[in-house]
Amino acid sequence: MKHFSLLIAFFSLLFSSCAEQQIANAPPSTYELKQNYPNPFTDSTAVEYGAPYVEPNSAAPWIRVVVFDRFNQKQAILVDNGAHPAGRFKVTWYANGVNGFTVAPGVYYIELQQINLSGPSLGEDVFTLLRIAALKQ
């Protein structure tokens, strides 16, 4: 039974998130998505994004960072965080798709989606889009 649990843990790690998130430093004044590096990339690429400080009486926004292919098919969800804290963050994408397998070489797009959960701009989305390139591994 112990080996079965270890096997499940291994496959959960293998097929779970294809990104990791690290806090970088002080929050920006507006939402931002910086160009990935390296670009083009082979096995992984890092993307930095930022969320500004939100007033204490306001709900923090929902933030998503999503990778799409050239056919607008979702390939990876790097961040999907409700009540996202303010700050600058770095996400590393290991070129894995939503199915857990490595994506094909080609052009991809990283999109920052910000959904307001309260206030006068309730439900409004803010989108920022970057073009990236994956090379053959």
Say what each PLM segment does:
Residues 2-7, 12-26:
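Short, compositionally biased serine/threonine- and acidic-rich segments at solvent-exposed termini, linkers
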Residues 11, 53-59, 98-100, 116-122:
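Alpha-helix termini
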Residues 18-24, 32, 37, 47, ...:
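C-terminal tail/sorting-segment detector
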Residues 40-41:
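Acidic, glycine-anchored loop motifs typical of Ca2+
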Residues 45-57, 93:
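Aromatic/hydrophobic beta-strand junction motif of beta-rich domains
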Residues 60-65:
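Exposed beta-strand and adjacent loop surfaces of beta-rich binding modules
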Residues 68-75, 108:
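Short, glycine-anchored, charge-dense loop/turn motifs used at functional sites
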Residues 80-120:
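Short, surface-exposed loop/turn motifs with a glycine/proline- and acidic-biased composition
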